[in-house]
Curated annotation (Swiss-Prot):
Protein name (database record): DNA-directed RNA polymerase subunit beta
Pfam families hit by this protein: RNA_pol_Rpb2_1, RNA_pol_Rpb2_2, RNA_pol_Rpb2_3, RNA_pol_Rpb2_45, RNA_pol_Rpb2_6, RNA_pol_Rpb2_7
Cited SUPFAM superfamilies: beta and beta-prime subunits of DNA dependent RNA-polymerase
EC number from the UniProt entry: 2.7.7.6
Amino acid sequence: MKDLMTSYSFTEKKRIRKDFGKHRSILKVPFLLAIQVDSYRAFLQGDVESSQRKDIGLHGALKSVFPIVSYSGNAALEYVGYKLGEPMFDERECRQRGMSYGAPLRVTVRLVIYDRESSTKAVKYIKEQEVYLGEIPLMTENGTFIVNGTERVIVSQLHRSPGVFFDHDRGKTHSSGKLLYSARIIPCRGSWLDFEFDPKDALFTRIDRRRKLPVSILLRALGYSNEEILGEFFEINTFHINPDEGVQLELVPERLRGEILSFNLTDGGSVIVEAGKRITARHVKQLEASGISALAVPDEYLIGRILSHDVIDATTGELLASANSEVNEDRIIAFRKAGIESVGTLWVNDLDRGAYLSNTLRIDPTRTQLEAQVEIYRMMRPGEPPTKEAAQNLFHNLFFTFDRYDLSMVGRMKFNRRVGRKEVAGEPVLYDKKYFSDRNDEESRRLVSKLGETSDILDVIKGLCEIRNGRGVVDDIDHLGNRRVRSVGEMAENVFRVGLVRVERAVKERLSMAESEGLTPQELINAKPVAAAIKEFFGSSQLSQFMDQNNPLSEVTHKRRLSALGPGGLTRERAGFEVRDVHLSHYGCLCTIETPEGPNIGLINSLAVFARTNQYGFLETPYRKVVEGRVTDEVEYLSAIEENQYVIAQANTLTDDNGQLTESFVPCRFQGESLLKPPSYVHYMDVSPMQTVSVAAALVPFLEHDDANRALMGANMQRQAVPTLRAQKPLVGTGIERTVARDSGVTVNARRGGVIDQVDAGRIVVKVNESEIIGATDAGVDIYGLIKYTRSNQNTCINQRPLVNVGDIVASGDVLADGPSTDIGELALGQNMLIAFMPWNGYNFEDSILLSERVVEEDRYTTIHIEELTCIARDTKLGSEEISADIPNVSEQALNRLDESGVVYIGAEVRAGDILVGKVTPKGESQLTPEEKLLRAIFGEKASDVKDSSLRVPPGMDGTVIDVQVFTRDGIEKDKRAHQIEEYEIKRVKKDFDDQFRILEGAIYARLRSQIVGKVVNSGVDIKKGEVITDPYLDGLKKSDWFALRMKDEVAVEAIDRAQKQIQAYQKEFDQRFSDKRSKITQGDDLAPGVLKMVKVFLAVKRCIQCGDKMAGRHGNKGVISNVVPVEDMPFMEDGTPVDIVLNPLGVPSRMNIGQILEVHLGWAAKGLGHRIQRMLEANAAIADLRKFLNEIYNHDKSLVGERVDLSQFSDDELLNMAKNLTDGVPMASPVFDGASEQEIKRMLDLAELPAGGQTQLYDGHTGEPFDRKTTVGYMHYLKLNHLVDDKMHARSTGPYSLVTQQPLGGKAQFGGQRFGEMEVWALEAYGAAYTLQEMLTVKSDDVQGRNQMYKNIVDGDHQMVAGMPESFNVLVKEIRSLAINIELEDN
């Protein structure tokens, strides 16, 4: 949205959208592919110096695996650094040759061998070497990867964040419906650790979801005794035992709450609590006020309490009672007898102090640390005999070693926050003070000195007990604070690390040999596992997807997609309703609208427009800071965790000119609730009304008037729009179209500003501004090659068209050329059609669409599809296949489109069944018929020993051959056609380089001319000393003689020398580049094993719109064309204009997508304004009048922020140019949730001199009579979707059959038949059509002999049929025999 002082770029001046937005956008829409591009850049760190690299990505993975030390410890392989080489082929060549676009990774490693004899580990020798570790795929600048010649996208994954989570079973486990609480520690890699309660309130633990053990076994394995465990988890009541009778309790009043005493509780004679009454909080306060420190209680009060420590007779050393045992009468007597003065008991009750760990200790069979570790060993490795070392090592490796366990930075941050610690950083392993204090190695001492008294496992168990006690809440796992994004870079790093770990194992074994045999690092490292892991991930991972390339929007959306599926994620079948649902925390992070319909609903989401990921991978969204009720322009990004504590106002909250909130109560969000708050309470405000939606949803105008289900369909169907022959900008847009087109990468944008020097259909040359030239070697020329008629992944056509003319002045970022579905740099997915909402003879029943023949004639929805057909010549056992024009038993006419090499000409128009590439295959020797013998005698060998296996045009396809590529294996002789293609390619490349050089050379000479004209000469060709250099003199001089000129002016001489060096350097560089390109073109191709030659033929198929094609608007209003009607029969307006499309009005009210009606009204107004401008231009109106009218359109209402278009910036020529572009309609922008109001639409209709109600009288095309009432008419942006009837229609007579059942295959791809199923059989039975049914079940299906005979009969003109035995009956017989039941068919 434009502010008053915005200056317009060259592209924007061509056509400005009238903006109805009322809220100034203070934040530009960020780069839409940033989530992909930034993530992979951080992974590669290719542009960072080796010493400056951070420990992430490739560098992090290499550092985590190296150094690799041999088993003996006498040799080590250390990592020094890495560098990425130059890719062998560029993106275009990779696409063409079916290769992967990547760069070689070379890692420098250092082999260190230590002296065995020396006691101090002295170094024996060091060898440093560069090792090749395979190809690393490179990302194209549009965020895609080219794998085996196809463009793929790695979709980001939304997975559960590492850390600790508390949950309960929602009462589903136990029949009583009791909530069983559990906690789970999830690391980034390593074993999962679960804690859970059982219905009897004992606490258990599981490791990696195996069988459960009492949690005390885990604590005992850490080295805690019973007393220490009880001391950690319980508060202790101390009782002093009187020598004769009675007990003194050290009183903590709070601990008595809820108890019922059997005696009066008194304070100096006054009774505080009577016997038999429950002690309440009020009583506790009284007790605290009275200051009583001890309470005399009878012995019975102590009975049944649990001891916190072992009670030992001091004189004899006898154990009187162990910790965690209950006190009874006998024990009290024994205590008195032994002279025990005091005992400690656990403070537990049934309300909020459960005796959970005490209960657990009672079912724990182990007594010592070793027993506990052995028990864990038995659970993890059942059946293996445990030894002391094995049990200790296994336990230590589970959670306490850096190699096997990694919580990750994110996990540690989440863990510490959840257990209530202040600091967020820490160690990636689980830490326990007791366990590490008892171990006496260097690593443990470091951890103890750093982390001190904390204990991760204890903190989790305490947290779980607190929640069970009713203090604390469980986590919501669907909250975005508990789900994080794993992007390309992180996934690639994990895969790379897995490959490196495989290498590490092999290297460890070889290192011991390196000590004795003097191996080099290259001999030690085998890079295959790394390369294989990376190839597998980019080629076949569930998240590596074939890019959706229907149109620019589908590309952008695919790259911004977030999937909950994939490795380490959910599965469709197991994902419940909660995971899929919209969550409060999605606001501003994930789109609440765009998600697929069907089994994946809610599991695949789209990133909201402004969302980004933070350093931990959590999604965050921007907000404007509000200070004391005033909105500032300061923007802060908050994640879902942080925004919980703030009050956030909506973007459309009313403010005055100073940003002060004007309403007395502001609608806000706070902790997931919607409420009204005074302005002083507000902390933040949304940055934009479209903050909650994704790019696709933000492209739907009047989205706020559509039902959510239909909006979802509208957002999804825009991605299926096929690029039309001529793109047409939407008359009613949302203002984000230009951003999407720019970021999608389909347009050509100027890298630097300058003047257009040359333009043709394939190339644009820009002479760069002097101010933007960098360095002395930069010639200041940018050359942009345009993509012409290339096939996309979805077989649509990618083509770029220049928008600029020679002499145009462009700035950096301006659009130089349009791509598919873009119009002057704006996304344009469909066409603006004149639409009427009315029934028409039943042709728009059930969402059908009635189309005017004019639309077909004008090619409004004609699309070009490019099909790639491949013919492969292989080496077979009987000999090699051959591509040639000499094919047996084929007529001359069938071969007339092939050249002598047997390959079709470019430009040939072909139809289904035509031969594209002639190919013959050797066939095995068989008995020759007499005729064949005769042919062989006449023509020699050839005629019979090969069969025709040519590539033909598939059924249902016709088109024009636009390109042929021939690939030949190295060492196989190239045919004539391959040489022709090669020569053409070399010529094209040579011309390209020559042109580039000429342009650069021209630019250098032009700059040199400006520096030397007017200077005095010392010496030179055809010029005397002392003369002045003039333009005519230079024009008559040979270019090479310029460098012989010498002047007095040192600066000019330097300029001449510099120009000469520049030209020589460029000449050398271009020669080198040309020879590289030439060798790439002429070298043999790397084909699959057994393939000798491959020919690819590209067909351009023109598809006009027809009955059966699917179309849709942007509001989920989809339909199928039912009829194409002559123009003269369509309803027409009073001025005779026939409508283009007739839609059913009943499709609107029940679907509740009213946005389409508003779009139609505003679109009509936009078109009407265009007509008014056209009339003014045709009448040659004064420029001032035109300026005034445009001002009235754009700058009428000052309440609209977007309405301040500064027309004074436009010169008269620019204004006229813009007016010409507006004659087709003045484009409008109605931003999402901030769109045009009813009054504004009415005003636009008035200004366009159209009825303000948006309805007009239509007349019947058949009779010319007016219809009974007025009709809603207007312009809607309508799309043709990639569900074309041509792709679906299919017919078969005979074709392939299934091997076992001998029934025809199914589906168009297999050239299958239509299944005559069970229900269809019932229908024929009901009609009594017995012979038809017999035919269906036998000769038309799987009666093999019958159908062959039938074929012969039809050829002979005999229409009889003999039904035999269906093959499926034989299959049934065989299957029953496999059950050992014999069935035989007897002839009766």
